[in-house]
From Swiss-Prot:
The gene is atpD. Its EC number is 7.1.2.2. GO terms for molecular function: ATP binding; ATP hydrolysis activity; proton-transporting ATP synthase activity, rotational mechanism. Its main location: membrane. This is ATP synthase subunit beta. SMART domains: AAA. One of its GO terms (cellular component) is proton-transporting ATP synthase complex. HAMAP family: ATP_synth_beta_bact. Keywords: ATP synthesis, ATP-binding, Cell membrane, CF(1), Hydrogen ion transport, Ion transport, Membrane, Nucleotide-binding, Translocase, Transport. ATP binds at residues 155-162. It comes from Streptococcus pyogenes serotype M5 (strain Manfredo).
Amino acid sequence: MSSGKIAQVVGPVVDVMFASGDKLPEINNALIVYKDSDKKQKIVLEVALELGDGMVRTIAMESTDGLTRGLEVLDTGRAISVPVGKETLGRVFNVLGETIDLEEPFAEDVDRQPIHKKAPSFDELSTSSEILETGIKVIDLLAPYLKGGKVGLFGGAGVGKTVLIQELIHNIAQEHGGISVFTGVGERTREGNDLYWEMKESGVIEKTAMVFGQMNEPPGARMRVALTGLTIAEYFRDVEGQDVLLFIDNIFRFTQAGSEVSALLGRMPSAVGYQPTLATEMGQLQERITSTQKGSVTSIQAIYVPADDYTDPAPATAFAHLDSTTNLERKLTQMGIYPAVDPLASSSRALSPEIVGEEHYAVATEVQRVLQRYRELQDIIAILGMDELSDEEKTLVGRARRIQFFLSQNFNVAEQFTGLPGSYVPVADTVRGFKEILEGKYDDLPEDAFRSVGPIEDVIKKAEKMGF
């Protein structure tokens, strides 16, 4: 095990000098430095660059407070390795695979795998055309998810990405019954804590591994924690042959962490100050999140959109890797429509008659047509009023508003805040409900009866309570 000494500490970036003649550590190797003489406080560094003349530049996975020049650094000779397998289920880790749930740490002989790997080769890949039912009407109808596919939840600050991902965990993890891996990347610690206790109460935690590198942690941890969660998911896919659900909240923070250290590593920034290696880093992560002939990984990723600008390089780079996109729209939150999913901007590769069936496809495209026409008529309504519309257009606007409200529903995970029970709506009930609205069966019911309900039967009950 070769050793060197700290030459420079600049925030999360540490330069280490190795003696001439010593073997230099390889890129991505883990180095260990002890802050105290009795070797109880250690910090893990990861090699990012080799500068020449025995100097390597590393990124710290923990806070560099207390590090000084001259401290000894040991090369472990391998990349950061994390525990994998059944022992990880029901547990909470950090980026290094250390348990942070106050329970017994892992045994020394637990199976471990490095977080840096190659993506599966082309001939190992497998595609699926099976729909993953979420129980959320707007998603199942207009932007359905594929089993073994990749989904992005796009939205600005405070439009409901984390609540939506928590509802998907609640619905899919319980219905799916398989293995789930949740990776918190640079998000609020409070939300992670709430999610942990919620999963513990519901019993889902027994089939879930949770990995966190939250907002307060250094950029090195936030940059690598997604790989830690992915490594655990890959093991269940490749070795155990399981169908795995991988939740990542938030992919933008992974990019943001990379941009924080990029300038300190000596790289010239590119567009909007992001790292020049943005597309490469995103590709290396996303290409590993895939389904093979051994098992599948269905990934659902929350992606923050800075200032609601979808042309920002971070969300724009992620778009290219996804099968389905669920776009959250601030205007809908202002109208009190939750989940605030934009039915026209969201899309899915799965919305085709060959995959969802002729009836589902016909209903979904007609819903989109009606909503698109309503959007076009809104300017006329705002300037001239409803009276200027033809009878046919007035009917269409009425149905469009009912559809818009019917796309909302109460969430199980939000019940503690709203006091209203959540609902899970099977795909068949969703398609039937929208088909009947399009046929004009409920034109006489008030629009408010369609707001925040489950299946169409709930609308009828709500209308009866309102005196209709």
